[in-house]
């Protein structure tokens, strides 16, 4: 039976899956202590002030936005962004494969009266022509039903981390501006995507009115999110956040852990992708195994084993060197692996 993870907290294990480091409670406490020693933790009051405010200010600057607000979850960040963008026009265009459309129930409709219109069935994103047709149909029906906002999610978890091409983002958001439709980026994994595509974060964010960033995906905070955008749009969200039960009494632990990661994220992931490219090229010189990228991919790669390799024995051999594959993918000759930033500083003598 192959092992799926290491129980040794001191081991230099490599996990080829997931969206953050495998941090134990002890790891988190150690990082908090380090942050407090170096920078000093400052408490907040219902998610206002202190270290939370510092995170908001740094995120606003990194994302090129006027303001930013802490949210306890990405679901709430996306919800409040669309709720406040759609004050009069209540219809929202979303990708059919998006988190907002598939994983939030009917929350936007039930709680904020917004109607989601999915486009781009079973694809990473809809096309500009699909968008034009939807807008045209909304204007020419018996009742004019204009759109208030549009969402782009990138990378897309349901499509193996594939990204929306930057040129497509430009064309879609330009057309929305011409039609007075606000644009929101579900950029939960934006920092990682920027490292993968080598397109600066701010080049992505300048296309959108509002941007959501996850704090637990790749930024190693246990929870939390950031929503960035215009100050006059975000300030009223302080009240909405509280109304929705999202004004945590003390959120500074979450903020501090994300701040600690921000200081090294760009350089760390740059090294991770450079190292993985070299590693994959070396592996592809071996017989019986092939690693390939997805079209417009980010950090998820496809691995194929030849019929001569037993998948279970392959996993077992890796686990003996503390290298672990996704336990949710049962042994198969075709599976995926993720580029995670601990790669480059954990050498393995295999």
Indicate residue ranges for each PLM-predicted region.
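Catalytic PLP-binding core of fold-type I/II PLP enzymes
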Residues: 162-194
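PLP-dependent aminotransferase-class I/II
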Residues: 112-155, 163-171
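Conserved N-terminal alpha-helix of the aminotransferase class I/II PLP-enzyme fold
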Residues: 24-73, 96-102, 109
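Active-site C-terminal subdomain of aminotransferase-like
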Residues: 151-157, 200, 206-287, 291-298
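Conserved C-terminal alpha-helix-loop-beta "cap" of PLP-dependent enzymes
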Residues: 4, 88-89, 284, 288-350
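Conserved PLP-anchoring active-site segment centered on the Schiff-base-forming lysine
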Residues: 84-102, 132
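N-terminal amphipathic/basic leader segments beginning at the initiator methionine
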Residues: 1-35
């Amino acid at each position: 039976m192959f092992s799926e993870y290491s129980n040794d907290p001191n081991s230099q294990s490599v996990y080829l899956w997931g969206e953050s480091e495998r941090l134990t409670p002890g790891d988190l406490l150690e990082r908090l202590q380090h942050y407090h020693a170096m920078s000093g933790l400052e408490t907040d009051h219902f998610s206002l002030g202190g270290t939370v405010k510092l995170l908001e200010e740094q995120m606003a600057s990194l994302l090129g936005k006027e303001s930013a607000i802490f949210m306890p979850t990405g679901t709430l960040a996306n919800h409040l962004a669309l709720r406040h963008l759609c004050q009069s026009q209540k219809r929202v265009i979303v990708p059919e494969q998006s988190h907002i459309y598939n994983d939030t129930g009917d929350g936007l409709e039930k709680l904020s009266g917004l109607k989601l219109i999915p486009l781009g069935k079973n694809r990473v994103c809809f096309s500009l022509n699909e968008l034009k047709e939807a807008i045209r149909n909304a204007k020419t029906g018996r009742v004019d039903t204009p759109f208030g906002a549009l969402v782009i999610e990138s990378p897309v978890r349901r499509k193996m981390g594939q990204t929306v091409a930057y040129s497509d983002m430009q064309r879609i958001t330009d057309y929305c501006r011409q039609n007075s439709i606000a644009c929101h980026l579900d950029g939960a994994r934006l920092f990682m995507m920027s490292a993968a595509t080598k397109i600066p974060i701010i080049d992505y964010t300048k296309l959108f009115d509002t941007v959501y960033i996850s704090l637990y995906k790749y930024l190693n905070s246990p929870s939390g999110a950031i929503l960035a955008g215009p100050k006059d749009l975000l300030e009223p969200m302080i009240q909405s956040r509280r109304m929705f039960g999202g004004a945590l009494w003390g959120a500074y632990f979450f903020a501090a852990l994300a701040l600690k990661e921000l200081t090294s994220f760009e350089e760390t992931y740059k090294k991770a992708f450079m190292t993985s490219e070299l590693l994959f090229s070396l592996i592809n010189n071996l017989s019986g195994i092939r690693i390939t990228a997805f079209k417009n991919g980010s950090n998820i790669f496809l691995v194929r084993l030849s019929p001569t390799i037993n998948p279970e024995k392959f996993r077992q051999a890796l686990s003996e060197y503390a290298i672990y594959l996704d336990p949710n993918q049962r042994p198969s000759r075709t599976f995926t692996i993720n580029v995670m930033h601990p790669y480059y500083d954990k050498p393995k003598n295999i």
